[in-house]
Swiss-Prot record:
The lineage of its organism: Bacteria, Bacillati, Bacillota, Bacilli, Bacillales. It comes from the Bacteria. ATP binds at residues 37-44. This is Spermidine/putrescine import ATP-binding protein PotA. One of its GO terms (molecular function) is ATP binding. It holds the Pfam family TOBE_2. InterPro entries: AAA+_ATPase (IPR003593), ABC_SmlMolc_Importer (IPR050093), ABC_transporter-like_ATP-bd (IPR003439), ABC_transporter-like_CS (IPR017871), Mo/tungstate-bd_C_term_dom (IPR008995), P-loop_NTPase (IPR027417), PotA_ATP-bd (IPR017879), Transp-assoc_OB_typ2 (IPR013611).
Amino acid sequence: MKKIIKVEAVEKHFGNQVIIPPLSLDIKEGEFLTILGPSGCGKTTLLRMIAGFETPTKGNLLLDDEKINDLPPYKRHMNLVFQHYALFPHMNVEKNICFGMKMQKVPVAEQKERAEEAMRLTQLLEFRNRKPAKLSGGQQQRVAIARAIVNNPRVLLLDEPLGALDFKLRKDLQRELKNLQRNLGITFIYVTHDQEEAMSMSDRIVVMNKGHIEQIGTPKEIYNKPKTLFVATFIGENNIVKNGEGYVAIRPENVKVRSVEEPILKEYHLGHIEDIEFVGNMEKLYVRDEKTSELLMAYQTAEEAAQWSIGDNVYVGWEQEDEVTLN
């Protein structure tokens, strides 16, 4: 797949503080790429440099192999959608969507045609004459997205656009965004701290920490094969166990809990259940390993967990193939 954006050894300094040390990243044309990390990791700064709102201190940004470090945002063929939608309150939906085209002196007939298609894609046709104050948060977000895609950008940049919405609406819009990206075929670069959001929408995920890229991969690769201690502890839940000079990670769904009355493999250790936590369709057992004193997590169905009580002695273990060695 063709590379549309290349980030080559880019750094960002604010005064003497290095926010992003040398960082390189290739972004493929037509992919949904999510930059994921905790607050302060540099993900939004990286997005703003790609958009042209921040200038790299060192290194180069390339679009279609052309250097764009000094190119102003409006010449980059990219649009940016923020968490705060910045809609014009005195304009209705259609006029908000057409505003950028009007400034670019696009013919009125073409404005209408392109706005119509953008509203169709974002399910806004019935709201075209409403002003922002008469729209829900999700509808306002759709207007911001429609306004961003109506100019046919090469790349759409999204900075935590769903962060202010409630859980159910967020889930609905996640599906809509992924379908929209698939239908448009343009590159989406999405910034979030929400792991579930990243996992559900992305073709690839870039996990950042303290300005560094910890790992790049598909959602399955990131979840099943974390490369570093940070990724293993940041993405989902993991049991981190000392193994010689390093560590291994074992997902709770791979940890087995057995009765002390069962014949057991030698790799299993004696432990006792310290707590049982209800987590929806599963129950989470906290088991203290008597040999290592590690507190291990194990997921079980409600039916499996019904046999246990806090304080029970059990055997706990896992298959070696379920261990992931961490750097």
